[in-house]
Amino acid sequence: MSLFGDTIAYLLSLIEDGEGKAELAEKLHCWFGGKEFDLDSALEWIKNKRCLTDIQKALIGASICFLKPKDQERKRRFITEPLSGMGTTATKKKGLILAERKMRRCVSFHEAFEIAEGHESSALLYCLMVMYLNPENYSMQVKLGTLCALCEKQASHSHRAHSRAARSSVPGVRREMQMVSAMNTAKTMNGMGKGEDVQKLAEELQNNIGVLRSLGASQKNGEGIAKDVMEVLKQSSMGNSALVRKYL
């Protein structure tokens, strides 16, 4: 995959699946695909995207600034504050040393990625802030390599947290994870489905999940809710009360 393709993949790995992720993916493919765009407008879009966390906004914003460093008229607080607000004085010092001594000597994406892999996330955040404030001191490949290494660490943390919740010894936590996954699937189908039948089916699924939450699903059968939602989406001939009859 190309340099920009790798960057898009790492950035999207940070975001939870859903309609917002699909919309962001389309934007990233346009920005990194060579189409001309206004940097300030793109940054405003990222800043106001509610489905993104502060760190995610900062990383995505920094990545497109690395594409067009000469077009940036001013530094953005929504980028600098999350990058500089994490970690201790010691980790920030490590990030500064990483940026000033090691990354300045790098010339390629993979070289920067491999060096960044050996540092903790808070140090990489501060290193990225230094790169963002002094873009002329680093090549675009080095800046994107450092950013992608950080994205991999962040995505790994999120995956472990999600897996821990999915394997929780508390049945209620496992059941709610299934409920959330099922609701996200139904809401995405409702938002992106173009056919009236698909949207109607998605609304029925959301109502069914609401009933299950209100009245309570059995501990034993709660595990299969998300899978059943997917099956209902594939086989729309099922009755709208199928889930309720099965789990109550």
Curated annotation (Swiss-Prot):
Q: Which UniProt keywords apply?
A: Host nucleus, Membrane, RNA-binding, Viral matrix protein, Virion
The entry's localization annotation reads: Virion membrane; Host nucleus
Q: Which GO terms describe its molecular function?
A: RNA binding; structural constituent of virion
Q: What Gene3D superfamilies is this protein classified in?
A: 1.10.10.180, 1.20.91.10
Region described as RNP-binding: spans on this chain: 165-248
Q: Which Pfam families would you find in this protein's record?
A: Flu_M1, Flu_M1_C
Which residue intervals make up region (Membrane-binding)?
A: 1-164
Return the SMART domains for the record.
Flu_M1_C
One BP term from GO: viral budding from plasma membrane
Q: How does it sit in the membrane?
A: Peripheral membrane protein
Q: What is its main location?
A: virion
Q: Name one GO cellular component term.
A: host cell nucleus
Q: Where is this motif: Nuclear localization signal?
A: 101-105
Question: Which family is this sequence assigned to?
Answer: Belongs to the influenza viruses Matrix protein M1 family.
Known role: Plays critical roles in virus replication, from virus entry and uncoating to assembly and budding of the virus particle. M1 binding to ribonucleocapsids (RNPs) in nucleus seems to inhibit viral transcription. Interaction of viral NEP with M1-RNP is thought to promote nuclear export of the complex, which is targeted to the virion assembly site at the apical plasma membrane in polarized epithelial cells. Interactions with NA and HA may bring M1, a non-raft-associated protein, into lipid rafts. Forms a continuous shell on the inner side of the lipid bilayer in virion, where it binds the RNP.
State the remark under miscellaneous: Influenza B virus genome RNA segment 7 encodes the M1 and BM2 (AC P03493) proteins. Normal translation produces the M1 protein. The M1 termination codon overlaps the BM2 initiation codon in an overlapping stop-start pentanucleotide 5'-UAAUG-3'. Termination of M1 translation triggers reinitiation on the BM2 AUG in the +2 open reading frame. Most abundant protein in virion. When expressed alone can form virus-like particles in transfected cells.
Q: How does it assemble?
A: Homodimer and homomultimer. Interacts with NEP. Binds ribonucleocapsid by both interacting with genomic RNA and NP protein. May interact with HA and NA. Cannot bind NP without genomic RNA.
Protein name from the UniProt record: Matrix protein 1
Task: State the taxonomy lineage.
Answer: Viruses, Riboviria, Orthornavirae, Negarnaviricota, Polyploviricotina
